[in-house]
């Protein structure tokens, strides 16, 4: 921890707790990547409100968007108190600017080629100039870590600031045993995957990063795994994959990818999964939930995704149900909740793979008891808002799905004029879609009262669709 650059400002508040310390913590950048990974598009600084001196941040280059392979920028810091963030745009003038998600309500000030905004709590933000979403600035303002593991503890794997290569050169991974805490100090850069295979009681913590691994973190045949705070930059495949595991918690994770098959968080035959406060910008599905795939078997249930930001440069922000087990034909995806989610982008030119909120079941899967609530869709470049389908996809499936039922969409808003019609389609009379509730749906500021206004293409084998104007408790 002594390698972190810590800048502290102490101030007094008239409170019974006495003195409160406000801090800004920035991380060293390893010399091996200092020049190679820098992006000169922006100069970013931060300071405590009321202070004179600014703290310079390192501007990382991150690749985004498989179609364009664009260079975007990322900065990170930890803080408490209230801080100002100053951004200088180094290439061209500022004609307009926006800080997203819009739900955060951050209104920046613009002065020439400078932009200023203030935050008083942790945030994951996109700063976009002149409508440019591909060469934008990502600002990750983390909470300060209070309980750092003891590096001398035999059950702690501690990665200090610097570049770390795995000793497993064949698999290019760091294998984590049971009952272990892995800590990535700020400024730690791992050039390999973290693998949790057939283990239990593992914690992966800290504000370090995984840089261009084959995949980010793999959790297979395991239980009770916590991932909190890390950043995964441009993995070749998944950011986090889960297979036949239970008790997975993911918090404050940040992810970028730009290649095909580089999904964000994918879970196959997993249960009891909690995802909270993540930022995923991926060039494949941001979050995908399946049952059987490869060597993983069983249902997918009790999944919660909360308070997060999803940005699908390619494919779906949310995709449920594609892969399953036609041999047994009895696997289920159920008791799934997505709540308080900002979707910043959905762009997919293939109609079969469109949908911000997609339940597309194949392989004899049944999807039921799924809720999407408080979802804000800011932009759809090409795609659909809703996609509910029972399908036999010849490319990925060995049989059709069994059905989709008991699905609730509540408090959904979307802005965008040129969006493809949403789709609801069953397969046959025994493999249908039923009992779908749309409650308080707002498109471009207008509250929806009918399927026609909702712009849904309702096809065969669909039953019991309801549209409610106002919230009513179940």
Predicted regions and their residues:
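Hydrophobic h-region of N-terminal signal peptides that target proteins for export
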Residues: 11-21
